[in-house]
From Swiss-Prot:
This is 71 kDa phosphoprotein. It comes from Human cytomegalovirus (strain Towne). Stimulates viral immediate-early (IE) transcription. Counteracts the DAXX-mediated repression of viral transcription. Displaces a DAXX-binding protein, ATRX, from nuclear domain 10 sites (ND10) shortly after infection. The keyword Phosphoprotein applies. Keywords: Activator, Host nucleus, Host-virus interaction, Phosphoprotein, Virion, Virion tegument. Residues 1-28 are annotated as: Disordered. It comes from the Viruses. It is found in: Virion tegument; Host nucleus. Interacts with the host protein DAXX; this interaction takes place at ND10 and induces the reversal of DAXX-mediated repression of viral transcription. Belongs to the herpesviridae pp71 family. Its main location: virion. GO terms for cellular component: host cell nucleus; viral tegument.
């Protein structure tokens, strides 16, 4: 798990971006 946490693509920023994208797609 620590490896995924260390990965830049698996960081909280990526999660927030994914949530934003999901919300935008849902609102479309």
């Amino acid at each position: 798990m620590s490896q995924a946490s260390s990965s830049p693509g698996e960081g909280p920023s990526s999660e927030a971006a994914a949530i934003s994208e999901a919300e935008a797609a849902s609102g479309s």
